[in-house]
């Protein structure tokens, strides 16, 4: 019988298994990755299940093995230098400024900053940003993967095309289809703004294009040709649902190419949440599926900052989501559909792309697995059926869409995966970004917690805080600045280099126990243009 790592790898990395099932396991280079006793429940995308209580645990010489690998959790007195810290924090940062025409920016967006800090290896988060070329507006989104990065990668590549096609008028769709039929060059519909590390899958591009083409052909057939206004909310919902349907269909049909066949199955059996913003002038739409968030930074008349939430988490803390799930399934499942704050006791987000194990019937799952490649058929995770699985689907990718009309006081938008929101309160996020963008920082009073502090000690604390503040504003990217605070903040609300160094020095097998992947996009709005829209009305 193959070793547990051979059964699970590479569909899901073994480090991921220890998080999913809360068991100790070997990673592919024979190291003891992690143990459930050290992993906070909030860090688990899936909760442990008894069926796997012994599956991943080494059966022999367990005590001697853990002693021999003690180095993995032994604290080491090693600190990164400030340049080394900056190198890590800035490795994935990206900035885009909207170009000016005749010395003026006529867009409601000045530009955006984005960045990522991995905790998983490889990182499971993705990000995307693109300008719509055949319609107006800009699309920006963050995608949080689980059970691997296959689904988040696919969604980050494909979703914006589905949205752009959904927004196109009938005449443009016909023009694109005629160009494909005649072999002419296609009209570009998106201009991507990507970091060099943000890649596209060349091997799957033809498959993805064919699915997208089928979608716009159906839109052409459904449209009578009459000129009608496009409903952005409806377009976003249709795009999300259609992409998820295509992900499911591609996995069911398979592909003659063995690599693509395995790829589409990996995409379907893993999962991803998505939070996407579409900005067109003063019209801001946010489509959210899962537990990433969109937060608007509002500057009040007195100069202070307030946070306006533009998305809702789709998890057990959302009463409306709990009610929705209970209404969609028989009363006999009222106590089992959500257990321990997880869908069927396993999955934390209640909406997501992929995750076909929570959408397909049991018969369909068995048929696809049995006819699939050996890696899939021999994989215990894919063959595992969730408990109390009676009336699928239990999971949907349909987004909740929020509309907001921008005002001059709306200065920026923060899109971020839950790795940020788990470490920082929304008000702190908005305050830190607002102070960074304006260059004004309001110091918080130093709290000494009831201890007696001499004047000299207080002077030392103030001097230390001033020194740290001077180094923080070296960031040229608002998302980097926010990540620096999320990882390195101390009790005074300032960045502690020692703490930041320790957090960034954690080995791969330990980093995920302390934090999640963090992906952030900060969109800065053009208050002058937004104000001009308001004056015209």
Swiss-Prot record:
Magnesium-dependent and calcium-stimulated. PDP1 activity strongly depends on its Ca(2+)-dependent binding to the lipoyl domain of E2 subunit of component of the pyruvate dehydrogenase complex. CDD domains: PP2Cc (cd00143). Its EC number is 3.1.3.43. Transmembrane segments: none annotated. Its main location: mitochondrion. It catalyses: O-phospho-L-seryl-[pyruvate dehydrogenase E1 alpha subunit] + H2O = L-seryl-[pyruvate dehydrogenase E1 alpha subunit] + phosphate. One of its GO terms (molecular function) is [pyruvate dehydrogenase (acetyl-transferring)]-phosphatase activity. The modification N6-acetyllysine is found at residue 202. Mn(2+) 2 binds at residues 144, 418, 516. Pfam families: PP2C (PF00481). Residues 1-71 form a transit peptide. It comes from the Eukaryota. Keywords: Acetylation, Calcium, Hydrolase, Magnesium, Manganese, Metal-binding, Mitochondrion, Protein phosphatase, Transit peptide. Mn(2+) 1 binds at residues 144-145. InterPro entries: PP2C, PP2C_BS, PPM-type-like_dom_sf, PPM-type_phosphatase-like_dom. Heterodimer of a catalytic (PDP1) and a regulatory (PDPR) subunit. Mitochondrial enzyme that catalyzes the dephosphorylation and concomitant reactivation of the alpha subunit of the E1 component of the pyruvate dehydrogenase complex (PDC), thereby stimulating the conversion of pyruvate into acetyl-CoA. Belongs to the PP2C family. This is [Pyruvate dehydrogenase [acetyl-transferring]]-phosphatase 1, mitochondrial. The gene is PDP1.
């Amino acid at each position: 019988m193959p070793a547990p790592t051979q059964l699970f790898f590479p569909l899901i990395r073994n480090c991921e298994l220890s998080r999913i099932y809360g068991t100790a396991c070997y990673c592919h280079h024979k190291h003891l990755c992690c143990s459930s006793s050290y992993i906070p429940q909030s860090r688990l995308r899936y909760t442990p299940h008894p069926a796997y209580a012994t599956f991943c645990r080494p059966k022999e010489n367990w005590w001697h093995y853990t002693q021999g690998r003690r180095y993995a959790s032994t604290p080491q007195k090693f600190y990164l230098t400030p340049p080394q810290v900056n190198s890590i924090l800035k490795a994935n940062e990206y900035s885009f400024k909207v170009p000016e025409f005749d010395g003026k920016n006529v867009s409601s967006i000045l530009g955006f900053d984005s960045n990522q800090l991995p905790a998983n290896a490889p990182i499971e988060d993705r990000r995307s940003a693109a300008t719509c070329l055949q319609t107006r507006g800009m699309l920006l989104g963050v995608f949080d993967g689980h059970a691997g990065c296959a689904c988040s990668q696919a969604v980050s590549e494909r979703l914006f095309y589905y949205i752009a096609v959904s927004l196109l008028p009938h005449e443009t769709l016909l023009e694109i289809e005629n160009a494909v039929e005649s072999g002419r060059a296609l009209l570009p519909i998106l201009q991507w703004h990507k970091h060099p590390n943000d890649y596209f899958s060349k091997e799957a591009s033809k498959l993805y294009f064919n699915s997208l083409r089928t979608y716009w052909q159906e839109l052409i057939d459904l449209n009578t040709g009459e000129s009608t206004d496009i409903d952005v909310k409806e377009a976003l919902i249709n795009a999300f649902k259609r992409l998820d349907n295509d992900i499911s269909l591609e996995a069911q049909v398979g592909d003659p190419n063995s690599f693509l066949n395995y790829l589409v199955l990996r995409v379907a059996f893993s999962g991803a949440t998505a939070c996407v913003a579409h900005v067109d002038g003063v019209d801001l739409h946010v489509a959210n599926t899962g537990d990433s968030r969109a937060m608007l930074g509002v500057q009040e008349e007195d100069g202070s900052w307030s946070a306006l939430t533009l998305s809702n988490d789709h998890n057990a803390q959302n009463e409306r989501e709990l009610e929705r799930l209970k209404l969609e399934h028989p009363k006999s499942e009222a106590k089992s559909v959500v257990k321990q704050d997880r869908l069927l006791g396993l999955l934390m987000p209640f909406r997501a792309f992929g995750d076909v194990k929570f959408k397909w019937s049991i018969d369909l799952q068995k048929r696809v697995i049995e006819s699939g490649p050996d890696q899939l058929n021999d994989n215990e995770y894919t063959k595992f059926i969730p408990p109390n699985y009676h009336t699928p689907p239990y999971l949907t990718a349909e987004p909740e869409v929020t509309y907001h009309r921008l005002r001059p006081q709306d200065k920026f938008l923060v899109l971020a995966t839950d790795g940020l929101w788990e470490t920082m309160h929304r008000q702190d996020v908005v305050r830190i970004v607002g102070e960074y963008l304006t260059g004004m920082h309001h110091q918080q009073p130093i709290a000494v917690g009831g201890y007696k502090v001499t004047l000299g000690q207080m002077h030392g604390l103030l001097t230390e805080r001033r020194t740290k503040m001077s180094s923080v504003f070296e960031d040229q990217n608002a998302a980097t600045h926010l990540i620096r605070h999320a990882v390195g903040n101390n009790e005074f609300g300032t960045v502690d280099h020692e703490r930041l160094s320790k957090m960034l020095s954690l080995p791969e097998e330990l980093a995920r126990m302390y934090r999640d992947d963090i992906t952030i996009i900060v969109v800065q709005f053009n208050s002058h243009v937004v104000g001009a829209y308001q004056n015209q009305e």
